[in-house]
């Protein structure tokens, strides 16, 4: 509506929570899709097409005006319409300008009074470099992790006490009691044997020396008579005053013992099950980091490789300081990775012991409290180093939640396209991140190779080989001339397969056929199906063999058909679903149809038989590792979540 009378009464607070990107999520369900901020208080909630938490806030508080955080339009609940006007002080215009500046991290625009928006923030990077905000969220991470520990500890204590009351629990309790009694008896027998040996030794030392060797031999007991003498002495010197009382048999005492005992208790935080805090529309980054950390080969590479000290060494060499530090830590060398395709098995993901913290294991890593939450202090920013430290935190078994400030800061500096708090595409971020990591490894390995230890150079080379080949596959593009049946083959590399939906899902009508779930195998079949090229547009080499290269005769164009097939499978297969269709001339909308897929995928029907004939049947089987899901109806806004298989916990 053109004029809303409720806008004139608006008095916007200067310290509104909407100015903090970390608050751009629903306080009730934590979604970042369709987030509305109340303009009368600091409440932020989701819209009516999600869980209606913003509408419920209006019904409870009677605050009529709310602003959509991403699209920046204002809605009045009392007028039940969108608001186009502003108040006399122009607060809505200023608020929109401020939010746009925060998203793009560009504070050079001016307000109506001529002041720049830079004065509204404390540093160039706004909240990402604000030490107070970082410290506040770091304390929240600690509090959340402590609460997680306490809840799981209390829950485990309750379930252990409850299990002891069941018939199976009583049976197990009795078995444990018998084992403890048997262990107690074995311990007492061991102590008696030690006491007997000590007394025999004291008697032998107190015996006066003999001059005759014959008498010395007589004093030495023979092996045949040693066992009876030990048995007699065992009976003679059995202690009777230090016997322990029998184990308690009362069920109440045993229940108390089980409830309070921390023995054999599993770690409260499963390694890898560490949440990444949304720092302001950063769900695209968090979801990608989660799936990369759950790829066993990729994770182990960056857990062993840390380029921070290497880059500092190269920087010192570039400035003239070429002296090699003797304190440089040697790096472990990864096993050589072959180019042969191997499926991603769960048995491969049974990583070596890296547990520490809650599980009671010792940790040789650095202090986890200071690794990731703070932004990098070094002038030489390294994405490999940030992946190294972040994976250490996520797989330490200590943290239930961590704020990846340093990772976001590095992404902003090294990938400017993702700078700011605007919503981004997760697929594009994954491609850019892998590209930057690859460039960093190549640059580090080739600059001043004599200054880098041989073990570190070898490790960098192997990690670069894994990063380049873990997602790398090859496609066979085959064009068949319909005039002479000649086939032209071209090998093309790929790092992911972009799959389109079948034609029935590209119509705007609400037919029942288009609403049925789509199968992933159906989308793969469409990707590899034969496609007829429109018209006579193909210049066949076979049909033009008799024509000279510089002849004046026109090139013979024929009809043809094209087909894509996989000729080399990657170690990790990435499938990208193209969920958009054109509605009208220039409008795109999302295809919200559910896609069904199994836990295992057989890629043999979609491969070129000539290229993959030598492979075994199990080489075509892939196990599901991770899924990144986009929630939302449009492309301009939404929320990303990641579902990953965790080998430590046995589930996602």
UniProtKB/Swiss-Prot annotation:
The residues annotated as the active site are 283, 639
* Residue stretches making up the USP domain: 274-652
State the Gene3D superfamilies in the record: Cysteine proteinases, Zinc/RING finger domain, C3HC4 (zinc finger)
What this protein catalyses is:
Thiol-dependent hydrolysis of ester, thioester, amide, peptide and isopeptide bonds formed by the C-terminal Gly of ubiquitin (a 76-residue protein attached to proteins as an intracellular targeting signal)
The UniProt annotation places Zn(2+) 3 binding at 38, 41, 57, 63
Region Disordered: list its residue ranges. 184-230
Give one GO molecular function term.
Answer: cysteine-type deubiquitinase activity
What Pfam families does this protein's entry cite? UCH (PF00443), zf-UBP (PF02148)
Which branch of life, at top level? Eukaryota
- Keywords, comma-separated and alphabetical: Cell cycle, Cell division, Hydrolase, Metal-binding, Mitosis, Nucleus, Protease, Thiol protease, Ubl conjugation pathway, Zinc, Zinc-finger
GO term, biological process aspect, one = proteolysis
**Zinc: is it a keyword of this entry?**
yes
Q: Principal place where this protein is found?
A: nucleus
Q: Which GO terms describe its cellular component?
A: nucleus
Q: What does this protein do?
A: Deubiquitinase that plays a key role in the spindle checkpoint by preventing premature anaphase onset. Acts by specifically mediating deubiquitination of cdc20, a negative regulator of the anaphase promoting complex/cyclosome (APC/C).
PANTHER family in the cross-refs: UBIQUITIN CARBOXYL-TERMINAL HYDROLASE, UBIQUITIN CARBOXYL-TERMINAL HYDROLASE 44
Its name, as the record gives it, is Ubiquitin carboxyl-terminal hydrolase 44
Name the source organism. Answer: Xenopus tropicalis (Western clawed frog)
Q: Which gene encodes it?
A: usp44
